[in-house]
Each structure stands twice: as structure tokens, then as C-alpha cells.
Regions:
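Auxiliary Fe-S-binding modules of radical SAM enzymes
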Residues: 1-31, 35, 217, 221-310, ...
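Canonical Radical SAM [4Fe-4S] cluster-binding loop centered on the CxxxCxxC motif
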Residues: 7, 16-18, 27-74
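Conserved N-terminal glycine/acidic-rich loop preference
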Residues: 20-22, 27-31, 35, 86-103, ...
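Conserved alpha-helical substructure of the radical SAM core
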Residues: 57-97, 107-112
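Short glycine-enriched, charge-decorated loop/helix-capping segments at active-site entrances
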Residues: 65-70, 166-171, 180-181, 250-256
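Conserved AdoMet/S-adenosylmethionine-binding subsite of the radical SAM
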Residues: 104-238
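Intrinsically disordered, low-complexity segments enriched in small polar residues
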Residues: 313, 319-322
Length: 333
């Protein structure tokens, strides 16, 4: 008779493996910020749910939203550019796929990219972000291509679907649109199932939640409790940004953005350790402003900065976008 229980030795092995992943990933380890770089590639344009805080338009000349790509890539283009950048910047160690839609709503492109990278650059760490709707269907492939970090956006664990229906108007499920509370309940069930499958396999899971005042602010402590039960390593609460010019449903209909005070209150309600106000400084570099036209001049400039600030405790990230006009975000951490 087989036993489904996990032995203490195997549990210890999983914990050691998870700690190794945390310590070497710039998104999770403060120490890794100083030594590693990450790159996100936009190979996944389609999405299978509609969020009231989201607008997937990109490459607009008047774009003002943070983190929006200028164009999308085919898997072959993405891999070529990743290998090129990795050859120039030796600190590159993490590759992520997060959109501009949902990574698992574009499984062919997402896993083709991961497969090619796994074959050509097996030392790179790979991660993806997803809304979780299709997560249970692709856990095997996630593990197959050594994708060991997954971020899931989960904004409610209300089993009635009431809260979720105010965030997600519809989902695309089994080739048809499902609306309202039914959609929210399906999404939640799939998210929880997928997260459990990942953590059972020792795959590191981070969860993002968007704080939407008057919608899910009272729900987030329940989200935090459930995520802890499922073995999620990190829960990140982000403020809703709902300016009218962003073109989202919330922005166009007067939903208030979340304030810093509301975010801190939500973090405290979720039992998070709130650090004192950071004295660290961030440096945002735009190549067009610096007029650094060649990759060699950019590389020399960045290496000079890293050397100059290596011993400074108040320096924690060098970030730049628009690098050689590549449709990606590259962050040196």
C-alpha cells in the first residue's frame, strides 16, 4: 500500500531547496540584489480574464502607466535577445514571462520560450506570472522546464464570488465567457488548486494582491491566511492605481486609488512585518537621456555604477528601461 505522506527528511530537503532559490533570486533576497540581474520578455499578449483594474493596450505614444511594454516578441526573438543581453551583462540570471497578457493564456509561446532557453541556457532561472485560471493544467510543464518561481495574482478568497465579481467581470473558460459570481468562483477554485500543486512540488510561489478600497480591503486578511496555509512564500499587497488616463474600468468609473496609509493598514491587518521607512535610494536610468548609444558604453556605465556603489548600504537597485529599444524590462539588482 502506497503512502501519500511526506517523510521528515524529504520535507527538510524541500525546505533547503526553497531557501536556495530564495537566496539566489533578486526578487526575494536583498543580498541577491547586489549580484544578479533579471529580464522580462513580452511574449504572451492574450489574456483569459478581464480585470477591472487592467488595460492591456501597449505601445501608445502617450503611455504613462508603469511597467507597460512597447511591443511584443515571438519566442525566437525573445530568446535571441536574452542570449545577446546575457552575453553582454554577466549578472543576468533570471528570465520572466508576465504578459502583456497572461503567461498561461499563451501556453504555446510561453513554453516554447522556456524550452528554447532551457536547451540553450540551462543555468538561467525562469519564472512566470499568472492569474491562475489555467495553472493546474500546466504545473507539469512548469516543472518540466525548470520554472521554479511562479507569481499568482489573487485578490479574494470569498467562496460566494461576491467580492470577485466586483473585480472580474468575466473569465474565458472552456471556450466561452463566464460572468459574475460564477466566474469568480471558478477562478478562485483554480487558483487555490494550482498553488497547492506548485507548493507540493517545491516550486516557489509568490502571491500578489491588488488593494481595491471598498472592494477587497476587508477580504485581504482572509487571502493572507489562506495563502499561508497553502505554503506561499511571499504575499505582496499592491495599491490600486486608477487614474482616468489609464483607461481601466475602475479609472473611468471613479474608483479611488489606494493610499499609502491604506496599504500599510492592509499589511498590518494581514500580519505582515512592516519595515520602517526605507532610507535606501533607487536610481532610474534612461539611456536616451544619458545619450548612451552603444551597448559597450551602456555596459561600461553600469559596471562603473555598480563598482561605485558596491559598498554603499543606501544603494539597492539600478533599473533602466528602453535598453536598445528592446521590448523588455531589464533590471540590475
Amino acid at each position: 500500500m502506497s503512502c501519500s505522506c511526506t517523510s521528515s527528511s524529504s520535507q527538510e530537503s524541500i525546505q533547503e531547496d526553497i531557501m536556495a532559490k530564495i537566496n539566489n533570486h533578486p526578487c526575494y533576497s536583498e543580498g541577491a540584489h547586489q549580484h544578479y540581474a533579471r529580464i522580462h520578455v513580452a511574449v504572451a499578449p492574450a489574456c483569459n480574464i478581464q480585470c477591472n483594474y487592467c488595460n492591456r493596450k501597449y505601445d501608445c505614444s502617450n503611455e504613462s502607466r508603469p511597467g507597460v511594454t512597447s511591443s511584443k516578441l515571438q519566442p525566437e526573438e525573445a530568446v535571441k535577445k536574452i542570449l545577446f543581453v546575457g552575453g553582454e551583462i554577466q549578472q543576468l540570471s533570471v528570465v520572466g514571462i508576465a504578459g502583456p497578457g497572461d503567461a498561461l493564456a499563451n501556453p504555446e509561446k510561453t513554453f516554447k520560450t522556456f524550452k528554447m532557453l532551457y536547451e540553450k541556457a540551462p543555468d538561467l532561472k525562469m519564472c512566470l506570472s499568472t492569474n491562475g485560471l489555467m495553472l493546474p493544467d500546466y504545473v507539469d510543464k512548469i516543472q518540466q522546464y525548470n520554472v521554479d518561481h511562479v507569481t499568482v495574482t489573487i485578490n479574494s478568497v470569498d467562496e460566494t464570488g461576491e467580492v470577485g465579481s466586483r473585480i472580474y467581470p468575466w473569465i474565458l473558460w472552456n471556450h466561452k465567457k463566464v460572468f459574475g459570481k460564477e466566474a469568480a468562483k471558478i477562478l478562485l477554485q483554480r487558483q487555490l488548486e494550482g498553488i497547492k500543486m506548485l507548493t507540493d512540488r517545491g516550486i516557489l510561489v509568490k502571491a500578489n494582491s491588488v488593494l481595491i478600497p471598498g472592494v477587497n480591503d476587508q477580504e485581504l486578511p482572509n487571502v493572507a491566511k489562506k495563502l499561508k496555509e497553502l505554503g506561499v512564500f511571499l504575499h505582496n499587497i499592491m495599491p490600486l492605481l486608477s487614474k482616468e488616463e489609464y483607461g481601466t474600468y475602475y479609472g473611468l468609473n471613479g474608483q479611488a486609488s489606494a493610499t499609502d496609509q491604506e496599504v500599510m493598514a492592509a499589511q498590518e491587518a494581514c500580519g505582515m512585518d512592516i519595515p520602517k521607512k526605507s532610507t535606501k535610494s533607487a536610481l532610474l536610468i534612461f539611456p536616451s537621456i544619458l545619450n548612451l548609444k552603444s551597448i559597450n558604453s551602456m555596459r561600461r556605465f553600469l559596471l562603473h555604477l555598480l563598482d561605485a556603489f558596491a559598498d554603499k548600504s543606501d544603494f539597492f537597485v539600478v533599473s533602466f528601461s528602453g535598453f536598445l529599444f528592446l521590448p523588455m524590462i531589464l533590471t540590475l539588482l
